[in-house]
Amino acid sequence: MSEENKTQQEEPQSSGRRGAIKKLVSVPVLGAMAYGVYRKTKYDRERRNIGDMFRLEPVTPPSAKEISPDGKTIRIGIIGYGIRGKQLLRAAGFAEPSVIDTWKEDARLHPSNNRYRDYMEQESLNIVIRGVCDIFDTYAEAAILSGSNINREGSDGVFGERPKRYRYYKELLAADDIDAVIIAAPDHWHGTMAIDAALAGKHVYLEKPMSWTVPETYIIRDAVKRSGVTFQFCHQGRQTDSYLKAKQIIEKNILGPVSLIEVCTNRNDPNGAWVYPIHETANEKTIDWKQFEGDEERVREYLGYMEENGLARYVGPEARDKFDLKRFFRWRCWWDYSTGLSGDLLTHEYDAVNQIMGVGIPHSATSSGGVYFFKDGRTVPDVLQTSFEFPERDLTMLYSATLASQRSRGKVFMGHDASMELSSSLTVKVDPRSTRYAEQIDKGIIKPDTPLITYIPGQENVDAVSSATELYFAQRGLLYAYVNGKRYDTTYLHIREWVECIRNGGVPSCNIDAAFEEAITAHMGTRAYLEGRTMYWDKDKEEIVRG
């Protein structure tokens, strides 16, 4: 055979071998590529599935009904025009002219501060202020001025008709031109005024706490239900975006079984500890001290409970009929008028938990604490911790409070599979030992050190706050909510819901049943502290019983 023929014969064989080798090599390469594509596709699909699992629906506050501008104008009376009374009337659309002046100047100096703009764009509730009642003349006159500020004007504005001042709240309740009342008096008057308002057929917006004594708690509930009036309890957190999102997270079981919840109060400011300034015009002539002392029946209930249980050390020490400006302006510091940390601040935390999880009244409460920082003669503790047990839910809720440290702590819901922290924002992190998400954690689809869900409503629109109290509520998401991208004061939304239920029917989101559950819970915590023993709830008899 010639060399030429040999070459021609060998080349195809060589090419065949090279081709075979290429084929043999290319098979696993293509297979690896295909497998890689498959794995990537599967990973992406699992990521999407996880995303779908944790996707939350848009939230709408209960108040997000259309205002009825052509409906009946609701005629309002306000009882109590202290710190919270001012805030409530302002939220309803009737601000003090001096506040409008301040907001306008703030907006001029700081264009990013939108508080004045938001307030002026707030829809009218179609209400009028017909009557005001406060036992301090200066506050009563300020309430009249605010109630006549129908156009939200500054000090140089044109005002409307002045509401009538009533020196006794029962006279206001008897007025034919008042449909509904906002009650923002001191704690020891809440129950009595709410009962009388309901029996007078007036719709009620009641500030917390619902009651000062345990016996009146039942009377309030019965009076509201029997009268059929529209009752809204004060918790504007019912309108808060992050709380509504948190409720969805619980309903979707994203956290798994929740066995422990921690809630707290942290303040570090005299104002936050109820050491309020004493007004320069306050004296025995401008204050009706006799009315301030309280309703005789309620006072008898209070004194009877204290005496029967050996708690006389918590009464006084000043005589109840002795005029005292400190006790008038700083009444929260004494059990003689106050419900303490449980009635004033635990109530917000408990209502948030009850709104989100529907826990109801706890089975038991155990408390401890004391007056550890503010040695100013107060009888109400400035440090308190209470453990509430819900055995039917396999759940404990811990409340801890100090008025001498502002270390920020949110509400923490601890589940087997994930934990949720809730304040002005919401964060969910998966537990590294989660059973439900173990496979996704192993695959790197879920990373325990990275938030699974983060929700920050209106993050870019945060204005300065003007007091320790406002800062406290801002940190808890209780100042603003967002409806269709527009920022609203949550108290405005809460009053708006109440007004629309009066006008068109319906039950407000924080109704008498929610208020009753909260009142009993707070009383259990308070009695546990005062008596130094665990308190239990007999749900069949509806009674607080001692351990």
Which residue ranges define each predicted feature?
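Hydrophobic, small-residue-rich alpha-helical packing segments that form membrane-like cores
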Residues: 178-182, 198-270
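Structural recognition of the beta-strand scaffold that forms the well-ordered cores
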Residues: 77-79, 130-134, 182-183, 205-206, ...
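Non-transmembrane alpha-helical segments in soluble domains
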Residues: 21, 85, 89, 93, ...
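Short, flexible loop/turn elements at secondary-structure junctions
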Residues: 80-83, 136-137, 186-187, 210, ...
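Generic alpha-helical secondary structure signal
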Residues: 192, 212-215, 219, 490-497
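Contiguous beta-strand/loop segments that form the cofactor/metal-binding neighborhood of enzyme cores
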Residues: 30, 55-57, 244-245, 254-513, ...
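N-terminal glycine-/serine-/threonine-rich beta1-alpha1-beta2 phosphate-ribose binding loop
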Residues: 2-17, 21-200, 218-230
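Conserved donor sugar-nucleotide recognition element shared by glycan-biosynthetic enzymes
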Residues: 165, 190, 239-242, 491
